Amino acid sequence: SVSALRENFPDAPIVADLKTMDGGYLEAEMMARAGATHVVVMARAHEETVKCVVQCGKDHGVGVMGDNLGCPDMVEGARQLEDLGCGYIVHHIGYDERRGIAAAGNRMPSPLDELKEVVEAVSVPVQAVGGLSIEQAVACPSHGAPLVVLGAPLTIDADSFQTASGDLETSLRMICNQVHGTS
């Protein structure tokens, strides 16, 4: 839970990625009170939900990340999230979306496909998520997306739920050093 993470990592940023679609203020407030530093709201939510999450972010001092997953126009979705007050954009190609498109024999989409356009469309920090290799994720800052996410698919084997070496901390340190250019 968020509160357990906050207790064990008192100085670390914690993103509560609930992908909020409704009940925006309530969900964001619950996560803020538990110790989250950032919450995530979806662009496909009603704009009133986005506004409620943004207001909660202001009231409780947490950052609001707007996620454009599933938007028919990803660039416009990012723009709308910024216009509604989100301080960060998560440019996101979903797991099911990628897998389904690939299973149908088509090229799997990547957040890199429209990353340049999303970055140019907004003035807030952008993070690219979904189907990236470690090398692509590490390179995101050079594409104008300074926030790097290392989710489970990038850091562990999906079948064994372990890193190749079995040492998650060492793997994460190596990746962070690459992102920060201190390898």
Each model region followed by its residue ranges:
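Catalytic beta/alpha-barrel core
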Residues: 13-21, 37-48, 63-71, 87-95, ...
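Long, contiguous secondary-structure blocks with strong helical propensity
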Residues: 78-91, 121, 135-137, 170-183
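Conserved active-site and cofactor/substrate-binding residues in soluble primary-metabolism enzymes
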Residues: 26, 48, 76, 110-113, ...
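Alpha-helix-loop-beta-strand connector modules within alpha/beta enzyme cores
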Residues: 1-19, 52-70, 106-128, 166-183
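Glycine-rich phosphate-binding active-site loops on the catalytic face of alpha/beta enzymes
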Residues: 36-48, 89-101, 143-171
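Active-site rim beta-loop-alpha module in soluble metabolic enzymes
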Residues: 71-121
